[in-house]
Protein backbone atom coordinates (compact mmCIF):
# COMPACT_ATOMS: atom_id res chain seq x y z
CA UNK A 1 0.00 0.00 0.00
CA UNK A 2 1.34 3.42 -0.93
CA UNK A 3 1.85 6.31 1.42
CA UNK A 4 -0.88 8.86 1.91
CA UNK A 5 -0.41 12.45 0.85
CA UNK A 6 -0.27 13.46 4.51
CA UNK A 7 2.54 11.01 5.34
CA UNK A 8 4.49 12.17 2.28
CA UNK A 9 4.11 15.78 3.42
CA UNK A 10 5.41 14.80 6.88
CA UNK A 11 8.45 13.12 5.30
CA UNK A 12 9.15 16.21 3.18
CA UNK A 13 8.88 18.45 6.27
CA UNK A 14 11.23 16.16 8.22
CA UNK A 15 13.72 16.24 5.33
CA UNK A 16 13.50 20.05 5.19
CA UNK A 17 14.19 20.21 8.93
CA UNK A 18 17.20 17.88 8.64
CA UNK A 19 18.54 19.82 5.64
CA UNK A 20 18.11 23.08 7.55
CA UNK A 21 20.37 21.75 10.31
CA UNK A 22 22.86 19.96 8.04
CA UNK A 23 26.19 21.34 6.88
CA UNK A 24 26.82 18.63 4.30
CA UNK A 25 24.89 15.98 2.41
CA UNK A 26 26.19 12.81 0.78
CA UNK A 27 24.24 10.74 -1.72
CA UNK A 28 24.97 7.01 -1.59
CA UNK A 29 23.83 4.21 -3.84
CA UNK A 30 22.55 1.74 -1.26
CA UNK A 31 21.45 -1.02 -3.65
CA UNK A 32 22.43 -4.42 -2.28
CA UNK A 33 22.76 -3.33 1.36
CA UNK A 34 20.89 -5.35 3.96
CA UNK A 35 18.88 -3.82 6.79
CA UNK A 36 21.63 -4.88 9.21
CA UNK A 37 24.27 -3.08 7.13
CA UNK A 38 22.14 0.08 6.93
CA UNK A 39 21.70 -0.04 10.72
CA UNK A 40 25.47 -0.39 11.07
CA UNK A 41 25.99 2.71 8.89
CA UNK A 42 23.46 4.70 10.92
CA UNK A 43 25.19 3.68 14.16
CA UNK A 44 28.59 4.76 12.83
CA UNK A 45 27.18 8.13 11.78
CA UNK A 46 25.65 8.93 15.18
CA UNK A 47 29.08 9.67 16.71
CA UNK A 48 29.64 12.52 14.25
CA UNK A 49 26.06 13.86 14.21
CA UNK A 50 25.24 12.26 10.88
CA UNK A 51 21.87 10.86 9.86
CA UNK A 52 21.22 8.37 7.07
CA UNK A 53 17.81 8.62 5.42
CA UNK A 54 16.41 6.41 2.70
CA UNK A 55 13.58 8.12 0.89
CA UNK A 56 12.20 8.44 -2.59
CA UNK A 57 14.03 10.84 -4.87
CA UNK A 58 10.74 12.62 -5.55
CA UNK A 59 10.29 13.43 -1.85
CA UNK A 60 13.87 14.68 -1.56
CA UNK A 61 13.33 16.76 -4.71
CA UNK A 62 10.29 18.36 -3.04
CA UNK A 63 12.33 19.03 0.13
CA UNK A 64 15.11 20.84 -1.77
CA UNK A 65 12.79 22.64 -4.18
CA UNK A 66 13.27 26.38 -3.82
CA UNK A 67 16.22 26.02 -1.42
CA UNK A 68 19.24 27.64 -3.07
CA UNK A 69 21.72 25.85 -0.77
CA UNK A 70 20.53 22.32 -1.53
CA UNK A 71 19.07 22.67 -5.04
CA UNK A 72 22.29 21.34 -6.65
CA UNK A 73 21.53 17.92 -5.14
CA UNK A 74 18.88 17.49 -7.83
CA UNK A 75 21.47 16.25 -10.33
CA UNK A 76 22.29 13.29 -8.02
CA UNK A 77 18.68 12.22 -7.51
CA UNK A 78 18.43 9.13 -9.69
CA UNK A 79 18.54 5.45 -8.83
CA UNK A 80 18.41 3.97 -5.33
CA UNK A 81 19.69 6.64 -2.96
CA UNK A 82 20.42 6.93 0.71
CA UNK A 83 21.04 10.45 1.96
CA UNK A 84 23.63 11.11 4.66
CA UNK A 85 22.94 14.49 6.26
CA UNK A 86 25.77 15.75 8.46
CA UNK A 87 25.82 18.49 11.05
CA UNK A 88 28.92 18.97 13.16
CA UNK A 89 31.87 16.69 12.49
CA UNK A 90 31.88 16.58 8.68
CA UNK A 91 35.27 14.88 8.45
CA UNK A 92 34.33 12.23 11.01
CA UNK A 93 31.08 11.42 9.23
CA UNK A 94 32.81 11.14 5.84
CA UNK A 95 35.42 8.84 7.42
CA UNK A 96 32.62 6.72 8.92
CA UNK A 97 30.94 6.37 5.51
CA UNK A 98 34.24 5.57 3.80
CA UNK A 99 35.19 2.89 6.35
CA UNK A 100 31.70 1.39 6.02
CA UNK A 101 32.01 1.30 2.23
CA UNK A 102 35.48 -0.22 2.46
CA UNK A 103 34.18 -3.03 4.70
CA UNK A 104 30.95 -3.81 2.84
CA UNK A 105 32.16 -3.14 -0.73
CA UNK A 106 28.48 -2.74 -1.69
CA UNK A 107 27.82 0.97 -1.44
CA UNK A 108 29.15 3.80 -3.58
CA UNK A 109 29.13 7.55 -3.00
CA UNK A 110 27.49 9.30 -5.95
CA UNK A 111 28.43 12.76 -4.75
CA UNK A 112 27.75 15.31 -2.10
CA UNK A 113 27.01 18.92 -1.35
CA UNK A 114 28.93 21.13 1.07
CA UNK A 115 28.14 24.83 1.57
CA UNK A 116 26.15 24.89 -1.67
CA UNK A 117 28.96 23.35 -3.75
CA UNK A 118 28.50 20.02 -5.49
CA UNK A 119 31.35 17.67 -4.55
CA UNK A 120 32.88 14.93 -6.65
CA UNK A 121 33.95 11.57 -5.22
CA UNK A 122 37.58 12.76 -5.16
CA UNK A 123 36.67 15.89 -3.18
CA UNK A 124 34.68 13.81 -0.70
CA UNK A 125 37.63 11.42 -0.37
CA UNK A 126 39.92 14.41 0.35
CA UNK A 127 37.57 15.60 3.12
CA UNK A 128 37.74 12.12 4.65
CA UNK A 129 41.55 12.27 4.67
CA UNK A 130 41.65 15.51 6.66
CA UNK A 131 42.62 15.15 10.33
CA UNK A 132 39.82 15.35 12.88
CA UNK A 133 39.04 18.51 14.82
CA UNK A 134 40.70 17.07 17.95
CA UNK A 135 43.91 16.20 16.06
CA UNK A 136 44.04 19.69 14.52
CA UNK A 137 43.57 21.31 17.94
CA UNK A 138 46.37 19.14 19.37
CA UNK A 139 48.66 20.11 16.48
CA UNK A 140 47.91 23.82 16.99
CA UNK A 141 48.47 23.51 20.75
CA UNK A 142 51.78 21.75 20.11
CA UNK A 143 52.88 24.46 17.69
CA UNK A 144 51.94 27.22 20.15
CA UNK A 145 53.78 25.39 22.93
CA UNK A 146 56.88 25.05 20.73
CA UNK A 147 56.87 28.79 19.98
CA UNK A 148 56.56 29.75 23.65
CA UNK A 149 59.37 27.34 24.56
CA UNK A 150 61.64 28.87 21.92
CA UNK A 151 60.79 32.39 23.10
CA UNK A 152 61.52 31.41 26.71
CA UNK A 153 64.87 29.87 25.73
CA UNK A 154 65.70 32.97 23.65
CA UNK A 155 64.79 35.36 26.47
CA UNK A 156 66.81 33.26 28.93
CA UNK A 157 69.77 33.19 26.52
CA UNK A 158 70.19 37.01 26.47
CA UNK A 159 71.25 37.40 30.14
CA UNK A 160 73.21 34.12 30.00
CA UNK A 161 75.14 35.34 26.96
CA UNK A 162 75.79 38.68 28.65
CA UNK A 163 77.00 36.93 31.80
CA UNK A 164 79.36 34.70 29.78
CA UNK A 165 80.73 37.73 27.90
CA UNK A 166 81.33 39.63 31.16
CA UNK A 167 82.98 36.58 32.74
CA UNK A 168 85.19 36.12 29.67
CA UNK A 169 86.10 39.82 29.73
CA UNK A 170 86.85 39.66 33.45
CA UNK A 171 88.98 36.52 32.97
CA UNK A 172 90.92 38.15 30.13
CA UNK A 173 91.49 41.26 32.28
CA UNK A 174 92.98 39.20 35.15
CA UNK A 175 95.64 37.51 33.05
UniProtKB/Swiss-Prot annotation:
An MF annotation (GO) of this entry: large ribosomal subunit rRNA binding
One Pfam family in the UniProt entry: Ribosomal_L10
GO biological process per UniProt: translation
Coiled coil: none
Disulfides per UniProt: none
Keywords: Ribonucleoprotein, Ribosomal protein, RNA-binding, rRNA-binding
Superkingdom as given in the UniProt entry: Bacteria
Record's GO cellular component terms: ribonucleoprotein complex; ribosome
Function: Forms part of the ribosomal stalk, playing a central role in the interaction of the ribosome with GTP-bound translation factors.
Complex formation: Part of the ribosomal stalk of the 50S ribosomal subunit. The N-terminus interacts with L11 and the large rRNA to form the base of the stalk. The C-terminus forms an elongated spine to which L12 dimers bind in a sequential fashion forming a multimeric L10(L12)X complex.
Annotated PANTHER family: 39S RIBOSOMAL PROTEIN L10, MITOCHONDRIAL (PTHR11560)
Protein name per its UniProtKB record: Large ribosomal subunit protein uL10
Biological source species: Synechococcus sp. (strain CC9311)
Lineage: Bacteria, Bacillati, Cyanobacteriota, Cyanophyceae, Synechococcales
The encoding gene: rplJ
Amino acid sequence: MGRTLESKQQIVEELKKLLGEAEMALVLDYQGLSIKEMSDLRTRLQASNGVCKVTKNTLMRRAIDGDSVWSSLDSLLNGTNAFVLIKGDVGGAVKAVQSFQKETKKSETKGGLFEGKLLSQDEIKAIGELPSKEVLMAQIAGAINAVTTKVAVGVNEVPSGLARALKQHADSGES
